[in-house]
């Protein structure tokens, strides 16, 4: 199904009916509204003006459209900020943020939590029983604009309580944090401050706990809203729209309270922000990198326990990246079908009409500001027509699992030990290598069952808890661990037995030294898989095992014991591809050597091919394949769908 984000409050009421009619005629079924409308719903304290929203919902419902109603807590109104200025967050430099944008509140503020409770309750009581309202989106893009981590007095107070609940005694905290170092010992929890504005870097254990606390505060704020919506809107779904390449909060944890996950897909903006080689950025400037959207579809399908929506789909140029090119003709259609191929239940475009005013006036919509349809509209309408003629099969478990850990991202943010070290970069390297082989991937959290997967990839898991170790033990196929796995304890210390810590129960080896390498400084590793120049990161391993790859100094780069492999270096794309191809072959999976820019995804018995390149390519379909969309020749920025005989 397809949907759209709509802002009736931005347009004259006389236009609403025509907009709703055109939405229906375009094949759209769902419309998200209301997520930034608090000041219009409550222009003054206690004076509620529901009439316009009542009318907007009724107008959409009259055309058979289903409404996704956003709770308006991402934008507290000016009168609320003036009455309670303490709700404004404080940045890491100690500066109080101001009114005039969005997301201007602190998750720990008791006052703001009560105000959020009040407005969400009123909203749910009024609209929770309406047939036209299919469900609710809580808030909007938690953490956008660097807002997960606040440094206000309320956060400090709440953090102290969080620490006491976690450690019980200040002696236990001192032991966990290693506060004997630099004379950091605390006599009570009341002495612990937030980890910022220190002369030298803060204690890494302190920082990690603060990041955990901040993520927990977002989850608590979201849960407050979910509980209200469950009570007053039974039978309605509750979701939240997460962001791309964003790790400040643990989406796996937060989504436990949701019916499914949603995310906002902007492939061109994300590609422009990625640390890609310049030539690759140029190659995919108008399409997005072929694995950007797919990675997030697979991630948020995992976050949503098998269910996800794209709540905002890029329809044209955006306004927030360093450069904002227009999508190549056909890409809006391709992105939409790609989301559906990965299991999206709804793809909703942002937005119906480009705003002529304010901060996002340069952000394209399905229509121009003068209401004329734009590129995205025509491509969305085509998808709707194609969808009407097809019944998508269910999504099956992928053959490969990739273990993704938000806590790992926090640990490497706290202690990268190398300027180029990026957890997301390493994850993306492995994910992209799998996709280039034509393999489908499920992204799962640590501790998720790995049964049924041909093999699993763990790009890096610094803290290995018992539930994760048990899942690795029960895995039926090979498990590949990347560098720095098992390198930290839960309190951010080096394991007494040395890394990989608990993984030594699976792999008899010790990492005794590590180094980060500046760009251009390479170590060569070679073995049965080939010869590979490697950079960025290298580890020295002691093990009673014969390495599968060896550095030129004779030290091992890749080890294996039974089903388990450990890679003691940052892999090159070539090494990742060769190693993953070997594991796939061992597991009996068919791998392909796909042309540059071509990617596949299977959904049931259907195979989807997406061509991100400027040249036509041949679809890797069998002779007897039955094409449902397109043909064996997949044109530039086009797709094909077929069913194998």
Curated annotation (Swiss-Prot):
<feature type="binding site">
    <location>
        <position position="106"/>
    </location>
    <ligand>
        <name>Zn(2+)</name>
    </ligand>
</feature>
<keyword id="KW-0378">Hydrolase</keyword>
<feature type="binding site">
    <location>
        <position position="155"/>
    </location>
    <ligand>
        <name>Zn(2+)</name>
    </ligand>
</feature>
<feature type="binding site">
    <location>
        <position position="150"/>
    </location>
    <ligand>
        <name>Zn(2+)</name>
    </ligand>
</feature>
<comment type="similarity">
    <text>Belongs to the glycosyl hydrolase 42 family.</text>
</comment>
<dbReference type="InterPro" id="IPR013780">
    <property type="entry name" value="Glyco_hydro_b"/>
</dbReference>
<dbReference type="InterPro" id="IPR013739">
    <property type="entry name" value="Beta_galactosidase_C"/>
</dbReference>
<feature type="binding site">
    <location>
        <position position="140"/>
    </location>
    <ligand>
        <name>substrate</name>
    </ligand>
</feature>
<dbReference type="GO" id="GO:0009341">
    <property type="term" value="C:beta-galactosidase complex"/>
</dbReference>
<dbReference type="GO" id="GO:0006012">
    <property type="term" value="P:galactose metabolic process"/>
</dbReference>
<feature type="active site" description="Proton donor">
    <location>
        <position position="141"/>
    </location>
</feature>
<feature type="binding site">
    <location>
        <position position="320"/>
    </location>
    <ligand>
        <name>substrate</name>
    </ligand>
</feature>
<dbReference type="GO" id="GO:0046872">
    <property type="term" value="F:metal ion binding"/>
</dbReference>
<dbReference type="Pfam" id="PF08533">
    <property type="entry name" value="Glyco_hydro_42C"/>
</dbReference>
<feature type="binding site">
    <location>
        <begin position="360"/>
        <end position="363"/>
    </location>
    <ligand>
        <name>substrate</name>
    </ligand>
</feature>
<dbReference type="InterPro" id="IPR003476">
    <property type="entry name" value="Glyco_hydro_42"/>
</dbReference>
<keyword id="KW-0862">Zinc</keyword>
<comment type="subunit">
    <text>Homotrimer.</text>
</comment>
<dbReference type="Pfam" id="PF08532">
    <property type="entry name" value="Glyco_hydro_42M"/>
</dbReference>
<dbReference type="InterPro" id="IPR013738">
    <property type="entry name" value="Beta_galactosidase_Trimer"/>
</dbReference>
<feature type="binding site">
    <location>
        <position position="102"/>
    </location>
    <ligand>
        <name>substrate</name>
    </ligand>
</feature>
<feature type="active site" description="Nucleophile">
    <location>
        <position position="312"/>
    </location>
</feature>
<dbReference type="InterPro" id="IPR017853">
    <property type="entry name" value="Glycoside_hydrolase_SF"/>
</dbReference>
<dbReference type="Pfam" id="PF02449">
    <property type="entry name" value="Glyco_hydro_42"/>
</dbReference>
<feature type="binding site">
    <location>
        <position position="152"/>
    </location>
    <ligand>
        <name>Zn(2+)</name>
    </ligand>
</feature>
<dbReference type="GO" id="GO:0004565">
    <property type="term" value="F:beta-galactosidase activity"/>
</dbReference>
<keyword id="KW-0326">Glycosidase</keyword>
<keyword id="KW-0479">Metal-binding</keyword>
<dbReference type="InterPro" id="IPR013529">
    <property type="entry name" value="Glyco_hydro_42_N"/>
</dbReference>
<dbReference type="InterPro" id="IPR029062">
    <property type="entry name" value="Class_I_gatase-like"/>
</dbReference>
<protein>
    <recommendedName>
        <fullName>Beta-galactosidase</fullName>
        <ecNumber>3.2.1.23</ecNumber>
    </recommendedName>
</protein>
């Amino acid at each position: 199904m397809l949907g759209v984000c709509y802002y009736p409050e931005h347009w004259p009421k006389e236009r609403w009916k025509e907009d709703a009619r055109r939405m229906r005629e375009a094949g759209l079924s769902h419309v998200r509204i209301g997520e930034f409308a608090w000041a219009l719903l409550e222009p003054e304290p206690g004076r509620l003006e529901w009439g316009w929203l009542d009318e907007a919902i009724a107008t959409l419902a009259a055309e058979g459209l289903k409404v996704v109603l956003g709770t308006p807590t991402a934008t507290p109104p000016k009168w609320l900020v003036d009455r309670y200025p303490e709700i404004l967050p404080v940045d890491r430099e100690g500066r109080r943020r101001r009114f005039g944008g969005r997301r201007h509140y602190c998750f720990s503020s008791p006052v703001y939590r009560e105000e959020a409770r009040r407005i969400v309750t009123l909203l749910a009581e009024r609209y929770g029983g309406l047939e036209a309202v299919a469900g609710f989106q809580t808030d909007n893009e938690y953490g956008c604009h660097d807002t997960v981590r606040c440094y206000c007095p309320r956060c400090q107070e709440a953090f102290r309580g969080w620490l006491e609940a976690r450690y019980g005694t200040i002696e236990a905290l001192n032991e966990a944090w290693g506060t004997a170092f630099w004379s950091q010992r605390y006599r009570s929890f009341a002495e612990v401050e937030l980890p910022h504005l220190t002369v030298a870097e803060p204690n890494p254990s302190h920082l990690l706990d603060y990041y955990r606390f901040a993520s927990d505060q977002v989850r608590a704020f979201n849960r407050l809203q979910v509980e209200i919506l469950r009570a007053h809107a039974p039978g309605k779904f509750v979701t939240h729209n997460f962001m791309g390449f964003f790790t400040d909060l643990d989406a796996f944890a937060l989504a436990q309270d949701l019916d499914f996950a949603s995310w906002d897909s902007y492939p061109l903006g994300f590609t422009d922000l990625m640390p890609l080689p310049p030539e690759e950025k140029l190659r995919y400037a108008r399409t997005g990198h072929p694995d950007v959207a797919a990675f997030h579809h697979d991630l948020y399908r995992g976050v949503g326990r098998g269910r996800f929506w794209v709540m905002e789909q890029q329809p044209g140029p955006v306004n927030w990246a360093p450069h904002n090119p227009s999508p190549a003709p056909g890409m809006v259609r391709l992105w939409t079908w790609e989301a559906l191929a990965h299991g999206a239940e709804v793809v909703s475009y942002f937005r119906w009409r480009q705003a002529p005013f304010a901060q996002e006036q340069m952000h394209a919509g399905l229509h121009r500001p003068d209401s004329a349809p734009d590129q995205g509209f025509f491509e969305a309408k085509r998808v709707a027509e194609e969808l009407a003629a097809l019944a998508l099969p269910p999504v099956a478990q992928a053959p490969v699992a990739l273990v993704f850990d938000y806590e790992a991202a926090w640990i490497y943010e706290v202690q990268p030990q190398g300027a180029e070290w990026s957890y997301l970069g390493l994850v993306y390297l492995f994910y992209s290598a799998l996709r280039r082989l034509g393999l489908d991937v499920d992204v799962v959290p640590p501790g998720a069952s790995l049964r049924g997967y041909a093999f699993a990839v763990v790009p890096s898991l610094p803290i290995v808890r018992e539930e994760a170790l048990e899942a690795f033990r029960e895995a039926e196929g090979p498990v590949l661990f990347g560098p720095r796995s098992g390198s930290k304890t839960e309190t951010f210390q080096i394991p007494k037995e040395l890394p990989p810590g608990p993984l030594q129960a699976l792999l008899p080896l010790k990492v005794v030294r590590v180094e980060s390498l500046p760009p251009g400084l390479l170590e060569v590793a070679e073995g049965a898989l080939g010869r590979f120049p490697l950079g960025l990161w290298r580890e020295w391993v002691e093990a009673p095992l014969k390495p599968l790859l060896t550095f030129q100094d004779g030290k091992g780069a890749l080890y294996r014991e039974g089903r388990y492999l450990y890679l003691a270096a940052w892999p090159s794309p070539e090494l990742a591809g060769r190693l993953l191809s070997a594991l796939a072959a061992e597991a009996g999976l068919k791998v392909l050597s796909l042309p540059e820019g071509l990617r596949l995804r299977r959904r049931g018995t259907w195979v989807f091919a997406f061509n991100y390149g400027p040249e036509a390519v041949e679809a890797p379909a069998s002779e007897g394949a039955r094409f449902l969309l397109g043909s064996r020749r997949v044109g530039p920025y086009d797709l094909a769908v077929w069913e194998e005989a």
